[in-house]
From Swiss-Prot:
UniProt GO BP: digestive tract morphogenesis; enteroendocrine cell differentiation
Record organism: Homo sapiens
Compositionally biased tracts (Acidic residues): 28-50
Gene: PERCC1
Keywords: Developmental protein
Protein name per its UniProtKB record: Protein PERCC1
Amino acid sequence: MAAGVIRPLCDFQLPLLRHHPFLPSDPEPPETSEEEEEEEEEEEEEEGEGEGLGGCGRILPSSGRAEATEEAAPEGPGSPETPLQLLRFSELISDDIRRYFGRKDKGQDPDACDVYADSRPPRSTARELYYADLVRLARGGSLEDEDTPEPRVPQGQVCRPGLSGDRAQPLGPLAELFDYGLQQYWGSRAAAGWSLTLERKYGHITPMAQRKLPPSFWKEPTPSPLGLLHPGTPDFSDLLASWSTEACPELPGRGTPALEGARPAEA
């Protein structure tokens, strides 16, 4: 009987009771008397008056409090003191560099060695020489003064005057060809004897601009399908024949001897 009457509570499906916390979530402020509220209001008014006096001190620079607040204020990147500090720092760095790496006298440092003692200052800079040449050419003159004498050099080593006009620059045996090809631009500076010497030596040579070159001179070697150049030797027999038929004594042989020497090479 008792076992059939007694059943667990979960079978009755009773509503669960909610347990409230002991402490409220929003505690109410403690009740204060009117005297305490008046004291708090007076303290707040005094603090506001103190802040107002501090602001006036910042506005009036004559007061001591204003100076104290200005000194206590942090200096930002936009303050006027920042450039002055950077300038002082750069001056200190430059002084240190001059002290350790600059020129020193024997009195300051007995072991000092002047590395600039053997150097010679240049007479004129490259820019000055460049502009001087441009001005001289614009006025219709030559790159050299007319009174400049021809340089005396040993035989076989011809010197051509430089653009700056300060000294002659040796160019080797090819300088004669340059002098012969550019003598028309020298003007009255070229000596008559020197021009005649060049004319006798190189006047019989036909310039490349006046020669009739064969097609092989303008034909480039064609690459093979693999991207490599043809291993065979290019055929310049027509070029050699055209040069040998001309009356050019600079070649060792003329006409038939040159062709005969070229045919065995082809074979």
